[in-house]
Amino acid sequence: MDEKVTIVGAGPAGMAAAIYLQRAGLAPVILERGAPGGLLRSAGLVENYPGFPDGIRGVELVEKIKRQLRKVGARITKANVVRVAPSAKGFAIQTDKRKFTTQAVLIATGTSPKGIHLQGPASVLRKKVFNEIIEIPGRVYGKKILIIGGGDAAFDYALNLEGQGANVTIITRSAPHCLRLLQERVKVRQIKMITGARPGFLKGSPKGLILQSRMGGQQIETAGDLILLACGRTPNLDILSPDLRRRLASRTDVPRTGVQGLYLVGDVARGNHRQTGIAVGDGIRAAMLAQDYLDRRLTK
């Protein structure tokens, strides 16, 4: 089957692009392997998005975007995209369910967490270490949560979880590198911080877990119930064929890529500039560029 335009990923960028393209009559195929919303689902209070003077919780904003998506008639298909490659008709997309071609494709796959080298029993690492808030099972009320990281995400996670009744400790290898506003809020909430520690070994305990870290030449131990990692992100570009990855141009003109009909939108292209407003703008601009591209193909 030959589709006109396909969107891989249903975070804010992908959904914004889908709304525009659906209203333009292009009936985009929207593929998402998980739950729509991306990292926005883990955000505590979103305050940089216009229209919400008191801020809005990430999960609430996701639901509003999903409602708008449904209202225009767009539908998200649950599928895991394993490869996007060039084809005579534009691009060939292989999912875990089918293979099809598309004339244009928007890559809105977001980012994946960077891991850190934590040693310990596999059962403890598998059951007690998480990369996103939404992965944590059950309620967090009363739980001792150790957050490893010193950026905006780590501090936002801390405020979010503390607001849900968790006992949070932030562990950073160096001085925090996040918004001063977030640091001030963490201080006001009296969230504990351990600065200058290098986590290394994790072991289970009768009451949860113990994280061993090196700090100032000494070993310290911090007890908790679970660990949440917030140590940076890396773009999800593995689904692009080697040929397409080689052909990607400098990302100074995002969402263009240098490959006709291929667009990178949102966090996957933005490095450290990960904001919902930027992602939404990228999605809409990519949708407009894709529409222009498809119109030109029709006139040839």
Predicted regions mapped to residue ranges:
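Beta1-alpha1 glycine-rich phosphate/pyrophosphate-binding loop at the start
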Residues: 3-72, 153-180
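A Rossmann-like FAD-binding core segment of flavoenzymes
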Residues: 69-95, 99-102, 163-252, 292-300
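FAD-site-proximal beta/loop scaffold in flavoenzymes
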Residues: 123-139, 226-278, 282-292
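Phosphate-coordination loops involved in phosphoryl transfer and adenosine-cofactor binding
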Residues: 2-4, 78-79, 141-143, 196, ...
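Short, well-ordered coil/turn residues at beta-beta hairpins
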Residues: 108-109, 115, 148, 230-231, ...
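Glycine/small-residue-rich loop that forms an oxyanion/phosphate-binding "nest" at active or ligand-binding sites
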Residues: 76-87, 91-95, 103-135
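Glycine-rich dinucleotide-binding loop and its adjacent helix/turn
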Residues: 111-152, 156-159, 164, 250-253, ...
